[in-house]
A protein has these predicted regions:
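Non-transmembrane, aqueous-exposed alpha-helical and coiled segments at domain scale
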Residues: 1-423
Length: 423
């Protein structure tokens, strides 16, 4: 942790790496927690005082009393879903109103954005990207084409701005011959807009830079993972924002020289939700076993996650584009019972072995594996790295050598206490 710096925490795979738990472990050390991109399509699952929460838009530092949490300009916000999420937290005793600040420049997901999402996916037929249907893509499209509604717009002449944006969407949907009725959804959405007005709506870029100037520390969290980044992920099967470290600069309004540590989170294996290429995917009983042991189902959608062995080619690429300084390995305990662990160290692309992540991994990619002995030990009760079995220590050393980055934190179970910080 660096005073006067922003430390960035992000996923290195296809999302669902376990960022929620890690943020919960790290936040006590920081003064402020900020979210820099994404929307309610991805959820962080956290356990706090025996209760499970899924946070979609609200930063995970909200459980730490007295800390300011900021929703940055790079986030897209659905007022109705935000209201549900915030009210559920308030009902469980967490006072948000003074501590949760929302950027004026964050874009609003409108009800018609969700309809557009469904209409565009229906048009694609068998080429569907597999969106969550939450309207994320169309909202970012409006942002880039300079047609978006922002949180700051709810403070002045909102009805007029909303009617204009909605009319534009209606015209597009009419041209697509897509039938819809948003009467009930819109009613709740407008309630959400009113609810949003109760929170501090701020110039977050000024706020964060002033916080840094005063010598305080900021932990910045992203949603999803590097391999879903719109520029560097497995395009077109990606999200609509920059999930990488550089997205923290554009999504919060901070300079690159303000970035301190970059924590990269990975699972001890690999998962992916929805459509898209996945070189190490397992279609056999092993894949099913990993899914069952790891409870690999989407926090928001409930969708089954596709499971496979760890992909070191993709991880090396993720570490490179993010400038990762420390690795955090999640769900090591899921592999506790395996005789043999596999790790993909290279790809064969159309028969030629390569050790880098290529332009496309959609076709002709075959994983090249190294096999390592499993540790066959229940590690969930361990409290120190000194207790790790030799085979697991060897697995860690192997990964660190392959990835050329230290693994500083290892998770051996879902609870906050089941976290080993290495010396």
């Amino acid at each position: 942790m660096n005073k006067g710096k922003v430390d960035v925490l992000l996923g290195l795979q296809w999302g669902d790496e376990g960022k929620g738990k890690v943020v919960d472990v790290l936040t006590p050390k920081y003064d402020v927690v900020a979210r820099f991109q994404g929307g309610p399509n991805a959820g962080h699952t956290l356990e706090f005082e025996g209760q499970k929460y899924v946070l979609r838009s609200i930063p995970s530092g909200i459980f730490q009393g007295g800390k300011v949490n900021i929703i940055g300009n790079g986030v897209v916000l659905a007022p109705d879903l935000f209201m549900d999420e915030a009210k559920a937290l308030e009902a469980s005793g967490h006072d948000l109103h003074a501590r949760l600040h929302i950027s004026k420049k964050a874009h609003l997901i409108m009800p018609t954005h969700r309809v557009l999402d469904a209409a565009y996916e229906a048009q694609k037929g068998k080429d569907k990207v597999g969106t969550t249907g939450k309207g994320i893509g169309p909202t970012y499209t409006d942002k880039v084409s300079r047609n978006g509604l922002r949180v700051g717009d709810i403070l002045d002449h909102f009805e007029e701005k909303y009617a204009k944006a909605k009319a534009r969407h209606d015209a597009i949907l009419k041209s697509l011959n897509f039938d819809y009725d948003i009467t009930e959804v819109e009613k709740k959405w407008l309630e959400g807009v009113e609810y949003l007005r109760q929170f501090p709506i701020v110039d977050s870029e000024h706020e964060i830079n002033n916080i840094l100037k005063s010598g305080k520390s900021v932990l910045c969290e992203g949603a999803q993972g590097t391999m879903l980044d719109v520029d560097f992920g497995s395009y077109p099967f990606v999200t609509s924002s920059n999930t990488i470290c550089a997205g923290a600069c554009t999504g919060l309004g901070i300079g690159p020289n303000k970035i301190g540590e970059v924590y990269g989170i990975m699972k001890a294996y690999c998962t992916r939700v929805g459509a898209g290429p996945f070189p190490t995917e397992l279609f056999d009983e092993t894949g099913k076993t990993i899914r069952d042991l790891g409870h690999e189902y989407g926090a928001v959608t409930g969708r089954e996650r596709r499971c496979g062995w760890i992909d070191l080619v993709a991880l090396r690429y993720s570490i490179m584009v993010n400038g990762v300084t420390q690795l955090i390995m999640m769900k090591s305990d899921v592999l506790d019972g395996f005789d043999t662990i596999k790790a993909c160290v290279a790809y064969k692309q159309n028969g030629v072995e390569i050790d880098y992540f290529p332009y496309s991994i959609e076709e002709g990619i075959e994983p090249v594996y190294e096999e390592l002995p499993g540790w066959k030990t229940d590690m969930t009760k361990f409290t120190s790295e000194d207790q790790f079995p030799e085979a697991f220590k060897n697995y860690i050393s192997f990964l660190e050598k392959q990835l050329e980055t230290p693994i500083k934190i290892i998770s051996i179970g879902p609870d906050r206490d089941q976290t080993i910080v290495r010396k």
